[in-house]
Amino acid sequence: MCGILAVLGVVEVSLAKRSRIIELSRRLRHRGPDWSGLHCHEDCYLAHQRLAIIDPTSGDQPLYNEDKTVVVTVNGEIYNHEELKAKLKTHEFQTGSDCEVIAHLYEEYGEEFVDMLDGMFSFVLLDTRDKSFIAARDAIGICPLYMGWGLDGSVWFSSEMKALSDDCERFITFPPGHLYSSKTGGLRRWYNPPWFSETVPSTPYNALFLREMFEKAVIKRLMTDVPFGVLLSGGLDSSLVASVASRHLNETKVDRQWGNKLHTFCIGLKGSPDLKAAREVADYLSTVHHEFHFTVQEGIDALEEVIYHIETYDVTTIRASTPMFLMSRKIKSLGVKMVISGEGSDEIFGGYLYFHKAPNKKEFLEETCRKIKALHLYDCLRANKATSAWGVEARVPFLDKSFISVAMDIDPEWNMIKRDLGRIEKWVMRKAFDDDEHPYLPKHILYRQKEQFSDGVGYNWIDGLKSFTEQQVTDEMMNNAAQMFPYNTPVNKEAYYYRMIFERLFPQDSARETVPWGPSIACSTPAAIEWVEQWKASNDPSGRFISSHDSAATDHTAVSRRWPTAAARPANGTVNGKDVPVPIAV
């Protein structure tokens, strides 16, 4: 992952301003340690910190069209760049970068090209001919992007809020699937898939087609000019990613460059469930497996760094980010710069165990839609920033646009958990890859029940965090929590401890408003809490202690007050109930 910073329309154009923007851009250097770039045009600045994955020798940014009148700074990967280049026969490309195509697409089609991109991205593009600019973010929000406003009327964009929080009067999370245009002065949605309407589809389940689409999603993410691997926890999602990647490795140029042995990575406390399961999958797939251990104390020691990089105080996100943060450092030390991961499956297919209680297929579908729409606030945020903290890029095939469209078009009746029919969570994916003739995985792995990542690395991890924070936060501090933190008040000592660190690092009102909050049980949205009466009374941050599922489905997922309420969810030009100084046209 790269880091981008754009500042447009500043009042002061001086050497001091240029130096300040370079200084702020350096706050993103962990995301892109390979090279730094800056383009200045009058009162507009586009900065870039590069992590070189494609065309390491000539793909430095910012990137340009032929006459350098169009400038773009990009964080992301465009998987269909070769196909798009073929449509631009009259254009001359200067580099082998997959992202250069964005400048030429704008030149050819104007602002209406973003839905042509297949990939993960956030970018800012400046047209120097009239000083207009656009900014856009990928469909689901895999790549982070923040937008801010300076007192001088300047507009700011950054991959992480740490690069703009000190200089902007106000800033927000840039919404996924949106484009900002300076010509209209507002945001508009470019990604409008049928499932956004939450209308219940009736398409029958086609196991082979679903398998084919997922394999295509994994294969396109093997596009790389640097060493890579797969994050393997031993659960269904990461195991399927590893299996497909291993099976198709010899069809790509990766095989010729780095060999035909897939590298896999796992982290956990000694004796943790993930380590054992991942080792078994790695042995089955004959991967080059790397197993990392950490202690509870090492995780606790990293908490402040984790909160600084992830930019959240959400309890569940911090719990899961810490092992991933530690693992990414180890991965980078091996010379690996890109990994493929399994985020998104649970949201698409209702894989969290609380989905056992969905009363009907309509509510099941609506909950999956809500979960996908909020991924950029949780798992995408974690996966991207925990890896980017050490200059590693994470790719997520489950969040492929085409795959999501196919998966969300299946009649949700097929996703409902029905034990009398032998259907457990994510049954449609398990069945799609249940191939006796050419097995992808052993049966017991294919049908292994889900572990929350923060539990899978070792149950003592969460217990250790709770014990540690219990000692750091007094009862008196909790009694005054509402006075100290009137916005999103912490409901337990672990949440209070993380909030203290966050407020010290990011004291701005806008910063705390980027973190969603609200009632949640086992990672549910507030609406799903209505499914079970007992859930409404719980604020225990660990789903391990909630008897909300039948005995065959003991949930190890987390419980917290972590979801955006209606007042906290960006919509119709408001964020957390306050006006955003741009209109949003949906």
Curated annotation (Swiss-Prot):
L-glutamine binds at residues 50-54, 75-77, 98. ATP binds at residues 231, 267, 341-342. Residues 193-516 form the Asparagine synthetase domain. Transmembrane segments: none annotated. InterPro entries: Asn_synth_AEB, Asn_synthase, Asn_Synthetase, AsnB_N, GATase_2_dom, Ntn_hydrolases_N, Rossmann-like_a/b/a_fold. One of its GO terms (cellular component) is cytosol. The active site is at residue 2. This is Asparagine synthetase [glutamine-hydrolyzing]. The record marks 343 as: Important for beta-aspartyl-AMP intermediate formation. The keyword Ribosomal protein does not apply. The lineage of its organism: Eukaryota, Viridiplantae, Streptophyta, Embryophyta, Tracheophyta.
